From Swiss-Prot:
Disruption phenotype: SYDE1 knockout results in small fetuses and aberrant phenotypes in the placental-yolk sac barrier, maternal-trophoblast interface, and placental vascularization. Placental abnormalities include cystic dysplasia and apoptosis in the spongiotrophoblast layer, decreased or absent vascularization in the labyrinthine layer, defective barrier between fetal and maternal blood circulation, and reduced invasiveness of primary trophoblast cells. Residues 398-604 form the Rho-GAP domain. The modification Phosphoserine is found at S224, S231, S235, S244, S575, S683, S685. It comes from Mus musculus. GTPase activator for the Rho-type GTPases. As a GCM1 downstream effector, it is involved in placental development and positively regulates trophoblast cells migration. It regulates cytoskeletal remodeling by controlling the activity of Rho GTPases including RHOA, CDC42 and RAC1. The record marks R436 as: Arginine finger. The gene is Syde1. This is Rho GTPase-activating protein SYDE1. The keyword Lipoprotein applies. Residues 249-366 form the C2 domain.
């Protein structure tokens, strides 16, 4: 009778009998959950109830062990009883070991949780005595959580599903963690070393040694794991006590040393020890602080959020920064502002790197922060490099005499000036805005580098540099960066004396007299300035096209060719401010160059302009009006009104000519098919008139404004009016300061 019952019992334990899941597990799992030795059936339910209460598992609907079953087990032979009771595994194997078919669950179900959830909160301390009485005395509890009884098979009677079984496994983690901590030493490192090799704790680092600040230790005298702050630095843990203030040298940047003369190259190791003297306002709550490090205004490193203390905040962070031409190291202390939900600077300090490493490689400084506080840090400079040698100027910034000797250029004029002037005179004399518009900065940088490498190999053709403003910009940059200006101090005084004699007159000075003003200059400067004055005089002769009159040329080149500050021609009675003095000097520069351009002989006047005559403005030749033999009622025109806003460009020359026949106009129907782009753009169409043989008639815009709109009226009439206005506005106005 015993053998069939035993066989049936083991078949249920191993899951070989396929019964309804909820009922079979609730009934059959209660049998092997017994102690390894027979005990009376009465006291064990009480202990089991206490263990279930400690583990926070709801009681089973039916009693796990009845007196009948206990009597049955006692009636068995000792070997059979041990065989029946040996099917239950120890608690350690249930928690740690892999699941086997003898565990009472289906063989094919494997549940794996790589990152367990957080531990549940410990229960109230009232049932602590009953739990300790029912569990084995293995030592004090370090984490402060109430220990639970060893898990048994009866704890799964209410967990038929996999989710419930997984939650029960998660509830066993506090007990497992407690047992592992009791078996190991008290330090975090030994705890990691003695953890089982296959345990989840050691594999996924669930028991971290980095705690939160202010973690209280439990009774028994055992201290909590060593706390620290994780940050961007190399040392996330805080040392024991504050550093000694006497070990750090006070440092504060003086107002006169904020612009150091040199730079620093190398590797800087910065170790932060702490922040002191940051006294919060009375009644203020502690704030989260972080330290931001900047090198020459660029953020390079920062710490994590740190909870500020009453007077001193301990730090232990190390940063390694690569320095390239570094001068200033700035430390910003940022405080969290809950109003705007971001960090705001509350203190800052500056360190001049080139000055602190003179004669040493390491410094321990107490950097003074503004408005309050100190930053205790150690700065170590390693792998210091010498400053790279500055490239020697080959064209820009080189003295004129030295550049001419190096290039051996003909005429004692640098190649860059000859090439730029040649291209401007070839294709830029009729460009509006010459020397006043700026070209592309990137293209200018490319052209500058090309001149620095090899001036003779630079090609300034229109295919390579189509924008003439790039070439004019390079020429002005070169003249501006000369070590000595072309119009020197002696020449400046000579021109001022000539200006004191009266208005420049070619009859009084003559060509040789004006050129004789440059005799005080050296040969190279005299040849270069002569070439530039000839060029500017030629540019001003095309002022009808490029709007570069001698006055405009003097405004553009006066500050470039003359020094920044000249000695005044007569002493002033009283000193003025620096702004007034600079304005007066700037005005004198323009007057000196304007005098030279007006009195300079024009040897290269354009051939289309007669000698001694002023080039006229662009005004179309006045011709008789065109009279068409049209009847009055057959022509419908729309004359332009005198008042009202100007019509848009698309309707500027609008008119209804649909009633006109093809025999009335010489251009025929083609004229009515589209807009007259030739006349709108103001292009020269005199050749077309010569071919057709018809005289080209234009209406005088000034005399016959009320006349009907003429089809041959073009934009040149408007250009003539605009040029007249510009001529009146460009008249010289003498301003006396």
């Amino acid at each position: 009778m015993a053998e069939p019952l035993l066989r049936k019992t083991f078949s249920r334990l191993r899951g070989r009998e396929k019964l309804p899941r909820k009922k079979s597990e609730a009934k059959d799992r209660g049998h092997p959950a017994q102690r390894s030795e027979p005990k009376p059936p009465e006291p064990e339910p009480r202990v089991l109830e206490g263990s279930q209460a400690g583990a926070e598992v709801p009681p089973s609907p039916e009693t796990p062990r009845s007196p009948t079953r206990g009597a049955y087990l006692q009636s068995l032979e000792p070997s059979s009883r041990r065989w029946v009771l040996g099917g239950a595994k120890p608690p350690e194997e249930i928690s740690l070991g892999p699941r086997t078919p003898s565990s009472g669950e289906p063989a094919g179900e494997i549940w794996y949780n790589p990152i367990p959830e957080e531990d549940p909160r410990p229960p109230a301390p009232e049932p602590l005595g009953s739990q300790l009485a029912s569990s084995e005395p293995e030592g004090p509890n370090i984490q402060g959580a109430a220990p639970t009884s060893p898990p048994t098979k009866t704890s799964r009677t209410k967990s038929p599903g996999p989710a419930r079984r997984l939650s029960m496994k998660m509830k066993k983690l506090p007990e497992l963690r407690r047992r592992l901590s009791l078996r190991s030493t008290r330090t975090g490192r030994d705890r990691e070393r003695t953890a089982p090799a296959g345990s989840v704790i050691s594999r996924y680092r669930l028991d971290s040694s980095v705690g939160t600040p202010g973690q209280a230790s439990v009774a028994g005298g055992s201290r909590s794991p060593r706390g620290g702050y994780l940050s961007d630095g190399d040392s996330p843990e805080r040392p024991g006590g504050p550093p000694s203030p006497t070990a750090f040298r006070p440092y504060e940047v003086g107002p006169s040393a904020r612009t150091p003369p040199a730079a620093l190259w190398g590797r800087l190791s910065l170790h932060l020890y702490g922040l002191g003297g940051l006294r919060p306002s009375p009644g203020a709550t502690p704030r989260d602080l972080c330290c931001l490090l900047q090198v020459d205004g660029v953020a390079r490193a920062r710490t994590g959020p740190l909870r500020s203390g009453p007077d001193f905040l301990r730090l232990d962070h190390t940063f390694h920064l690569e320095l390239e031409a570094a001068r200033l190291l700035r430390a910003l202390v940022l405080a969290w502002d809950p109003g705007v939900r971001r960090h705001r600077p509350c203190a800052q300090g500056t360190v001049l790197l080139p000055t602190i490493f003179r004669g040493c490689q390491a410094q321990q400084l107490a950097v003074r922060l503004e408005p309050q506080g100190f930053l205790y840090a150690k700065l170590t400079l390693s792998e210091q490099q010498e400053a790279p040698a500055t490239a020697e100027p080959r064209v820009f910034g080189l003295p004129l005499q030295l550049l001419v000797e190096r290039e051996q250029s003909p005429g004692q004029v640098p190649l860059i000036i000859r090439k730029c002037v040649g291209q401007i005179e070839c294709r830029g004399l009729r460009v509006v805005g010459l020397y006043r518009l700026c070209g592309s900065a990137a293209v200018k940088k490319e052209l500058r580098d090309a001149f620095e490498q090899d001036s003779a190999a630079v090609c300034l053709s229109e295919d390579v540099y189509p924008d003439i403003n790039v070439i004019t910009g390079i020429l002005k940059d070169y003249l501006r960066e000369l070590p000595t200006p072309l119009i020197t101090q002696p020449l400046y005084q000579v021109v001022l004396e000539a200006m004191a004699q009266g208005h420049p007159s070619r009859a009084s000075l003559g060509p040789e007299g004006t050129r004789g003003l440059l005799r005080c200059l050296p040969d190279v400067e005299r040849a270069t300035l002569t070439l530039l004055l000839d060029h500017l005089r030629l540019v001003s002769s095309f002022h009808t096209h490029n709007r570069m009159t001698p006055q405009n040329x003097a405004v553009c080149f006066g500050p470039v060719l003359l020094p920044a500050r000249q000695t005044p021609s007569r002493p002033r009675l009283r000193s003025s401010g620096p702004g007034v003095t600079s304005a007066v000097d700037f005005k004198r520069h323009i007057e000196v160059l304007h005098y030279l351009l007006q009195s300079w002989p024009d040897t290269r006047r354009p051939s289309d302009t007669p000698d001694g005559a002023v080039a006229p403005y662009l005004r179309p030749k006045r011709q008789p009006p065109l009279h068409l033999p049209l009847a009055g009622p057959e022509v419908v025109t729309r004359p332009r009104g005198r008042g009202g806003p100007e019509s848009p460009p698309s309707n500027r020359y609008a008119g209804d000519w649909s009633v006109c026949g093809g025999d009335l106009l010489p251009c025929g129907r083609d004229f009515l098919s589209g807009p007259d782009y030739d006349h709108v753009t103001g292009s020269d169409s005199e050749e077309d008139d010569d071919e057709t043989g018809e005289p080209r008639g234009t209406t005088d815009f000034e005399d016959e404004f009320d006349a009907p709109f003429n089809p041959h009226l073009n934009l040149k009439d408007f250009d003539a009016l605009i040029l007249d206005l510009e001529r009146e506005l460009s008249k010289q106005i003498n301003v006396c300061l």
